[in-house]
């Protein structure tokens, strides 16, 4: 068999196939199946800070149907447990994913994911300003501020999921592709 080893985020992968967030990456059984099928790494579904009004299980929404209730209110404890279980069960890198809202939330949950054993972290940043006068550079600054804050708080590799709506990714990346 061909040697498909490669590197992603500084991590050695046995193959270039990275299973992105999907229903399969949301369970330990699905993660094991992906590893057995040849995935080189897995990206867990995002933990959404704005959905975490409480640290523990929440009450189901009144409008939720029976199929919606299974994972509702799982909160960060269940997510961090999945990170820890995946790390213990798999031989491939586990990338946790975070969609934060507040600067403190980005840092707090990123640190917890690292402590749970994540090999790397995907920052799923999607910032939509409701302020009409906010300039593009101010929006970019928000993204860079989040990345810098998480970088200072953690020691694992970071990937940043960007919106396709940036007007100048090269400018945002700065000289030589290095963040400003």
State what each model feature region is.
Residues 9-13, 70-73, 100-101:
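An N-terminal domain-start capping segment
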């Amino acid at each position: 068999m061909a040697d498909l080893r490669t590197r992603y985020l500084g991590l050695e992968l046995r193959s270039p196939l990275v299973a992105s967030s999907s229903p399969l990456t949301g369970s330990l059984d699905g993660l094991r199946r992906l590893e057995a099928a040849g995935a080189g790494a897995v990206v867990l579904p995002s933990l959404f800070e704005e959905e975490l009004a409480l640290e523990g299980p929440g009450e189901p929404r009144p409008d939720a149907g029976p199929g919606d209730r299974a994972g509702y209110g799982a909160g960060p404890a269940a997510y961090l447990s999945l990170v820890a279980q995946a790390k213990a069960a798999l031989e491939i890198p586990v990338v946790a994913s975070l969609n934060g809202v507040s600067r403190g939330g980005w840092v707090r949950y990123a640190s917890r994911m690292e402590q749970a054993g994540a090999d790397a972290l995907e920052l799923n940043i999607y910032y939509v300003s409701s302020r009409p006068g906010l300039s593009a550079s101010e929006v970019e600054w928000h993204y860079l501020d989040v990345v810098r804050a998480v970088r200072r708080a953690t020691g694992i590799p970071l990937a940043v999921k960007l919106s396709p709506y940036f007007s100048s990714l090269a400018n945002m990346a700065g000289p030589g592709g290095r963040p400003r």
